[in-house]
Amino acid sequence: MIKQALISVSDKTGIVDFAKSLSDLGVKLLSTGGTAKLLADAGLPVTEVADYTGFPEMLDGRVKTLHPKVHGGILARRDLPEHMQALEQHDIPTIDLLVVNLYPFVATIAKDDCTLADAIENIDIGGPTMLRSAAKNHRDVTVVVDPADYAVVLDEMKANGNAIGYATNFRLATKVFAHTAQYDGAITNYLTSLTDELQHASRSTYPATLNLAFDKVQDLRYGENPHQSAAFYRDLAAPAGALANYRQLQGKELSYNNIADSDAAWECVKTFDAPACVIIKHANPCGVAVGNDPADAYAKAFQTDPTSAFGGIIAFNREVDEAAAQAVAKQFVEVLIAPSFSAAAQQVFAAKQNVRLLEIALGDGHNAFDLKRVGGGLLVQSLDSRNVQPSELRVVTKRQPSAKEMDDLLFAWRVAKYVKSNAIVFCGNGMTLGVGAGQMSRVDSARIASIKAQNAGLTLAGSAVASDAFFPFRDGLDVVVAAGATCVIQPGGSMRDDEVIAAADEHGIAMVLTGVRHFRH
C-alpha cells in the first residue's frame, strides 16, 4: 500500500494534478527544490526532503536526496524482518512511491551555445540513483519516470485501496532501467564526441562510443523470409515526417518487407514539390511520376512498369482523394502511404480490408545517421541528403540541354538517387520511362532500363537519362543513346570522362555533370 511518495521532477507536466490526487488518497508527499515549491504554491501539504532528512541541500543542489533516510526508505525489503527492524531503529519511514524524471541533458546539449560546463551541470546524479534504487526494489516500491503513467497509477490505486500490483510495478521498473540506460548513453555519446576539453568544446560527428536507443513498436510475423524472426523498433527521437510515425488506418499487420519498402517509397516521394506518386518493389522504384493531382501522378507512374507494380508499395505526397483511390484499387497493392486519405478514399478501400493504409504527416526531418550492420560491427554514415541545384550543374558537351531537357534531367537525377546501384533511369515529361537497377555492370542496367520501357510500350525518343555514378566506359552511353535518349546527367569523375564526353558529342546529345555520386546498396 502506498502511504508516502517522494516527488522530484524536471518535467512538471501534470505533476500538480497527480500530487493532488495522491494527497486526496491520503498519501504523504515529500519533494525537493522547485517541485516542492510548485506543490506548496498549489496549496498541497508537502514536506521538503531537507526537512525530512534533517540535512540541508548543499553544493548548489548537487546533494539533495543522497541520504540514508531517502534510500533506506526506498531500498528496504518489506518482507525481510531485519530490513524493517533497521528502518525502525533509525526512524526511517518507507517511501512507497517514487516520481522522478531527470535533468534535461539531451535538450541542453542540443543547444548551439552549449558549453561543456553546461552539459556537466545537467548530468543528474540524485535522480538516477533514486530511480535505480526504486526499480531494483520494485516488489515493494512503485516508480514513475513518465508522466504518461500518472493516470495508470492513480486508477490502480483507486481500484485497490492505494495498492499497486506486481505486474504494474515490474513494467514501470523496466521502463526506468531503459530510461536511465538511454540517459547514460546520451552522456557517453556526448562526452566521447568531444575533441578537446575547452569550455566551448567542439564535437565530432562520430563519438568514440556509440549508444543507440530504440523502443519496440511491435513483433513482426517474420523477417525478410518466413524462417527469420523480426521486430520493428522506433527511434526515441524519430524526426518529423519519418515512416516510424505512421498511423495505420486499416489493413493487415505490416511485415518486415512492407516496412522496409514503405520507407523507400516515402523517402522518395517526400522529395517532390508537385503532386507525386512513387511505386516501390523490393526497395526499388518501378514507377515515379509527378502530375496535376494524385490520380494523374499514379496513372503516369503505373505506366512505367505495370508488371512490377503488382503487389507493390505506393506512396503519395498529397491527400489521396476518391479518384486516386479508385485508380489504385483496380490493382493488387500491399501498402498505400499518404499524408492523409479523404473520407471517400477510405470508403473505396473499405471493400479491400487487406490493403494497408498508412497515414504519415509530411515533414522534412531525417535520421541523424544511416546505419548498416556488418559482421561484428556497424557502419555509420551521414545521410545521402545532398540535393544538386541547377546552378551547380556543369554542361560538358557542345550541345546545351533545352529547358525541357533540363527539367527531365533533374527529375531523373532525383529518382536515380533512390534506385539500387548500378542505376540507370530513363525519364520524360515528369515520369519514369524505364528503370535499370542493381546490376553489377552499368551497361547491363542501361540495357534493362531500355527493355523495361519497350515492354511497357513507352517510347524513349527524346528521353533524359540519369546514371547514379559515372560511366566507366562509353558502352553504357552508346546503349542509352541507341534507345533514344538525347541528354544524360551523371556525376563524372571517371578516368575515361574525356572518352565518354567525346562519345556524347559524337552522338550530338547533351551531357551534364553533377559532381555528386548517389551509390545505393
Curated annotation (Swiss-Prot):
Similarity remark: Belongs to the PurH family.
InterPro entries the UniProt entry points to: AICAR_Tfase_dup_dom_sf (IPR024051), Cytidine_deaminase-like (IPR016193), MGS-like_dom (IPR011607), MGS-like_dom_sf (IPR036914), PurH-like (IPR002695)
Classification via Pfam families: AICARFT_IMPCHas (PF01808), MGS (PF02142)
Species in which this protein is naturally found: Burkholderia vietnamiensis (strain G4 / LMG 22486) (Burkholderia cepacia (strain R1808))
Boundaries of every MGS-like domain copy: 1-145
Record note on domains: The IMP cyclohydrolase activity resides in the N-terminal region.
Name of the protein in question: Bifunctional purine biosynthesis protein PurH
PROSITE patterns xrefs: MGS
Pathway of action: Purine metabolism; IMP biosynthesis via de novo pathway; 5-formamido-1-(5-phospho-D-ribosyl)imidazole-4-carboxamide from 5-amino-1-(5-phospho-D-ribosyl)imidazole-4-carboxamide (10-formyl THF route): step 1/1; Purine metabolism; IMP biosynthesis via de novo pathway; IMP from 5-formamido-1-(5-phospho-D-ribosyl)imidazole-4-carboxamide: step 1/1
BP GO terms, sorted: 'de novo' IMP biosynthetic process
Origin superkingdom: Bacteria
